[in-house]
Amino acid sequence: MASKRIQKELKDLQKDPPTSCSAGPVGEDMFHWQATIMGPSDSPYAGGVFLVTIHFPPDYPFKPPKVAFRTKVFHPNINSNGSICLDILKDQWSPALTISKVLLSICSLLTDPNPDDPLVPEIAHMYKTDRHKYENTARTWTQRYAM
C-alpha cells in the first residue's frame, strides 16, 4: 500500500510540482526522499535553497512522513536538529494529505511563522518583540547556510 501511494505521489509531483519546491527519492529507496525548498521571496529566507529530508513510515499514508530540514534555518518553528513544528506533521495529519501539500505548508511556515507554538522559544520571543532583529538574523543565516 505505502509504496504504491508513494509512487503515485512522485508521479503527481513530477507532473505538477508545487511552486518553488521539488522532491524525489534518494537513490533507489522510495521511502527516503530529499526535497528542495526555495526561500519565499516575501520572507527573510528569499534567495535561499533549503534541503529537507523526508522519511515515509511503512504504514504511510496512515502515519505522517518524518520531515526535517538539513539546511540550518533561523525560525521559531524549526530547531537546530531541523525538526519542524507543524500540526499536519503531527496530530493534524490526514491520509488525504500529500507530500506536495506538506511542502507547500512548510513554505508558508517560512513566510508566516507561528510564534504561539514555537519549537525555539527564544526565536519566537524575538519574532514577537523585535521583528526587525528576527528578520535580519534570519536573512544572515540564509546567506550563510542556504546560498
UniProtKB/Swiss-Prot annotation:
- Known catalysed reaction(s)? S-ubiquitinyl-[E1 ubiquitin-activating enzyme]-L-cysteine + [E2 ubiquitin-conjugating enzyme]-L-cysteine = [E1 ubiquitin-activating enzyme]-L-cysteine + S-ubiquitinyl-[E2 ubiquitin-conjugating enzyme]-L-cysteine
The UBC core domain covers which part of the protein?
A: 1-147
Annotated GO MF terms? ATP binding; ubiquitin conjugating enzyme activity; ubiquitin-protein transferase activity
Known pathway = Protein modification; protein ubiquitination
- PANTHER family, from UniProt? UBIQUITIN-CONJUGATING ENZYME E2
Record function comment: E2 conjugating enzyme that associates with the E3 ubiquitin-protein ligase EL5 to mediate ubiquitination of target proteins.
Q: What is this protein called?
A: Ubiquitin-conjugating enzyme E2 5A
Taxonomic source organism: Oryza sativa subsp. japonica (Rice)
The root-end lineage is: Eukaryota, Viridiplantae, Streptophyta, Embryophyta, Tracheophyta
Q: Which gene encodes it?
A: UBC5A
